[in-house]
């Protein structure tokens, strides 16, 4: 396997996180393209520095997003955005080194976040998550 830091994916992930995932400490997330994987169905992976290693190394949580170049690079721009959103969605609000599972990170929720992101880009805004939570809790 070959791993390369990807400045272009990093910029996209930073923009997405800044607009729709304010809990993500984007300076503690790095994006990589990988080449040479033998996996058949995986397009991307979210890796985390787990609690034990954080404690052993005396460092805070850190995430690495891996995009398998052979598959990811062939996708349309919109599909790439959805994959990046999907991987960012795995990062929990506590940003402690854990993961949200696929009960939460699913196609329906990815599509919703993608729509939110595209609306933010169109309107040059960020999402007010606190307002949205209050609104959801009232309904």
What kind of region is each of these model predictions?
Residues 1-78, 94-139:
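Metalloprotease/metallohydrolase-associated module, dominated by Zn2+-dependent proteases
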Residues 82-94:
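Active-site recognition of the HExxH zinc-binding catalytic motif
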């Amino acid at each position: 396997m070959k791993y390369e830091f990807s400045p272009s994916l990093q910029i996209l992930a930073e923009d997405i996180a800044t607009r729709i995932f304010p809990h993500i400490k984007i300076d503690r997330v790095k994006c990589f393209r990988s080449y040479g994987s033998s996996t058949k169905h995986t397009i991307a992976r979210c890796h985390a520095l787990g609690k034990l290693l954080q404690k052993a190394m005396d460092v805070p949580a850190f995430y690495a997003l891996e995009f398998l170049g052979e598959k990811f690079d062939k996708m349309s721009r919109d599909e790439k955005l959805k994959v990046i959103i999907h991987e960012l969605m795995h990062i929990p609000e506590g940003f402690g080194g854990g993961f949200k599972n696929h009960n939460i990170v699913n196609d329906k929720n990815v599509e919703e976040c993608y729509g939110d992101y595209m609306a933010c880009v169109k309107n040059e805004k960020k999402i007010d998550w606190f307002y949205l939570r209050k609104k959801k809790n009232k309904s």
